[in-house]
Amino acid sequence: MGGVIGFASKQDCVMDLFFGTDYHSHLGTKRGGMCILQEDGFNRSIHNIENSPFRSKFEQDIEEMKGNMGIGAISDGDPQPLTVYSRQGDYAIATVGRINNKDEIVQELLKDRPSQFMSMSGGGINNTELVAALISTGRDIVDGIRIAQAKVEGSVTILVLTREGLYAARDKYGRTPLIIGHKDGAYCAASESFAFINIGYKYKRELGPAEIAFLTPDEDKTVGEP
């Protein structure tokens, strides 16, 4: 399966992201990843965690990270988060879920517009890359997320980190939870609220199926109704 977590804070959030992602480690066994938005762009790190715990893999990486917004992911398959440069601007993205019609979506994208996909080991296509390609067909990030939600057969929960804030979108069937937490000067979205108490956040609410929220350090705003 997997888990995701993201932060929008007035203060440096690297340690919250580090521990918050680690607290999701029981949801996946293969890969972990973190991405921080810094003044000079995105700083991303991904490691295989099959044979070593998350913390030992990333404790050196976080020394080179500094920023107030970031996302993390634990995965049983796809390496993520990914960084994307598109007509909607640059962003980082992480997902959780299952896409049952992946081949159909790939063929549709290749037919309708210039597209290319990086092949992973084993010949598959990264689910998160595919979702990003769908988002890029939209007028903006919210419209792109709606397109992805409509096209995917199965379920996909999405975090998109932009320079303006964090988009958090729950899958359309509500199969994978996405929960909003809050502390003074910061908001976060996570697959599990278990992490909140350990990093000083309090439960605020759970997104409804297909709901899209936009988080900044000052607010949690619904920008796509459930």
Where are these regions (language model features)?
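Conserved short alpha-helical segments that host acidic/polar catalytic motifs at enzyme active sites
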Residues: 1-226
